[in-house]
Amino acid sequence: VRSRGLGDVYKRQTRTGLDGTELVTVDPATYQQTVLVPNLPKGRFVFTPDESTLLYTVEEEGPKEGTDLIRVLEPADRIPGFRDRSFIWRYDLKTGLYEQLTFGHTDTYINDISADSRYLLFSTSDRVYTSLPHSRNSLYKLDLQTMAIDTIWEKAPYVNQAAFSPDGKQLLVAGAGDAFDGIGRNIKQGQISNSYDGQLFLYDLASRKASPLTKDFNPNVIDAVWNRFNGQIYILCEDEDYQRIYTCDPANGKIKQVAASEDIIMSYALADNAPVLFYYGQSASNANRLYAYDLKGGKNRLVYDLSQDKLKDIALGEVHDWNFKSDDGTTIQGRYYLPPHFDPNKKYPMIVYYYGGTSPTNRALEMRYSMHMYAALGYVVYTLNPSGTTGFGQEFAARHVNAWGLKTADEIIQGTKLFCKEHSFVNEKKIGCIGASYGGFMTQYLQTRTDIFAAAISHAGISALSSYWGEGYWGYGYCSVANAGTYPWNAPEFFTKQSPLFNADKIKTPLLLLHGNADTNVPIGESIQM
């Protein structure tokens, strides 16, 4: 939805017409449609701010191998579409001229377009297997009038995307704490940064110098927008087990929370010419709701309550926060779900759910593993975010690196025991644990360390670190963070000691292994060999 100024608001959308894909405008007051382009080129596109041009991302199919014998050029060549490339094209809405702007050996990605529509910011990515990180990004500024190119940086590590400031003099850059020679890093001596923990930087185009924006800000940056209306930066981030919006003043670096009405903000959009933010989100016990937020007054207005429709006639149990201090004094955050019609005088079986990897188990109602669904079956459900999780600060996230169960498993075991001690309604002899992917690994690993669980479920779990690292499509990529600098040849004891497969004789708990036979990330062999 865009505005043509003077209060003339309209919606642009595509539809299939007689001559192909049509670009149309829709007047939201009358629903009258006007065809702007009768035969639009196919592909994904974005408007330039002046709405005179469409910038396309066009996929080109790469060279094919024969069907009988395939040469794998590099590990990523096993992934479908690896040899395809995406390039940027420009479509002039007035003249109909459609021209290619980028080409070459690597993909090119649209990052942003300047407010005056003159400059395009785009990037490329190169793979590097001999050092960390395994990808390096280059950023370019293209003058769409003269076609002159300005190389901002080449093959830089730990930087992801960039966007123009409203005046075009600075860039807002997303990356890891190690970006720009580590100016945004905030970890203890001896730690290795967890590059899944997102940071923001300001980059001055005149001086070519960067400065950190979120170095001392604990939440993990997911997305950010530099608003043209008020010049503030709006940040969507993981904040412990919440997903929140914060605003940052680029003039002084001060960050404050936007008082949204939901625990998990799924998506948001800012008006270009008004102090309005729209967002939708959900919480631990409700589905999505859409809101309008007044940036000046700080008030929320409910626009549409989808949750009311989705949860009609559904009874949910209560959800409570429950934290504990680990042996080293760290507060480990968690929460628990009670069955509907809970009776505190009864004894209930309990499920302990965790991921244990680097992403938090957040408070969303709707997720792959719905805690409320398990609670509805008569279980108490306890979930926690142990050391290594993003959203709790860089130091906490860095604990994930070269852990693979170390510290994390101890915290899960300690939390489970303390929870049972403090909650008499749990039947200590009927505790099960479940997790998937890294959580599946954690399920297997836990059974080599404790017998407190009556049953355990590993979904798509990793049983041997070396085979996951070498065979999974993204194994070496994830391991470039999860075990940075550690390989089977320089740390064979670590790869065996932390692998559940090499400790399988210690497992006495009934263990169910669930796996998809087409899994390419954690191949099914991880469960078969276990």
Task: Walk through the language-model features, giving the residues of each.
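Short coil/turn segments that connect the beta-strands within blades of beta-propeller domains
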Residues: D50-S52, D116-R118, D167-K169, F229-G231, ...
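Single conserved hydrophobic/aromatic residue that forms the stacking wall/gate
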Residues: V1-Y10
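A flexible loop/linker signature enriched in serine peptidases of the S9 family
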Residues: R12-V24, P38-G43, T57-F87, T102-T108, ...
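Active-site-proximal cap/loop segments of hydrolase catalytic domains
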Residues: A376, T383-M530
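Cap/lid segment of the alpha/beta-hydrolase catalytic domain
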Residues: D305-K429, A436, G470-W474
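Non-catalytic accessory segments flanking enzyme active sites
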Residues: R12, L55-V58, K64-G66, G81-I88, ...
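Short loop/turn segments that connect beta-strands within beta-propeller blades
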Residues: D27-Y31, D92-G96, D143-M147, D204-R208, ...
